[in-house]
C-alpha cells in the first residue's frame, strides 16, 4: 500500500518500483511530489535527485511511456509506479488487482494549453479551432475515448469513463 510518495523509495518496495523519466509528463511532477514527501525545501530538487540516485539500484526502470509501464506491471516486474490518470485505463482493465493510490501529500496534475503565435495571420482560424476543441461535443468525444480529461465543465460521462479521468466537481 502506498500512503506517501516517499513509500516509492522504501526498502519494502525496493526492486519493484518504476519511476517516470524526467523528460516525460510525469517526471517533473513525480520529482516535485517526492521532494514534498521527503520534506525538502524549495524548487532546486538537488536533494531529491540525490535521494533517487542513491536508490537507483532499487528502481526497476525510469519508464518513458505508460505502455512500457503497463507491460512491466502486467508481467509483475513492477508493482508500484506514478502515472497520469489519463493512462489508468491500461491498468484498470487488467486481470491483476491494481488500485489507485491516494498519497497523503496529494495527487499531481498537469494542464494542457493551446497557444497561438502573435501576428501569425491566422488568428480567426486559430480561435475557431480552440472553440471547436473546447466545445462540449469535442470534449465529450475526447473524454469518452479516454484520450484526455474534459476541460469543459458541461461534459457528462458515465461512471465507468469517469473512473479513468480527472472528472467531476472537485
Language model features: what each stretch is:
Residues 1-77:
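Extracytoplasmic ligand-binding site segments that recognize negatively charged/polar headgroups
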Residues 15, 23-27, 86-89, 105-108, ...:
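Solvent-exposed loop/turn segments at secondary-structure junctions
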Residues 16-20, 62, 79-83, 99-101, ...:
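Structural recognition of the beta-strand scaffold that forms the well-ordered cores
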Residues 21, 85-86, 145-146:
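Short secondary-structure boundary segments
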Residues 49-55, 94-118, 162:
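Periplasmic-binding protein-like
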Residues 69-72, 88, 126, 139:
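Short, hydrophobic alpha-helical packing/hinge segments within bilobed ligand-binding/sensory domains
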Residues 74-75, 79-97:
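A ligand-binding cleft/hinge motif common to bilobed small-molecule-binding domains
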Residues 108, 112, 117-170:
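Mature extracytoplasmic/periplasmic domains
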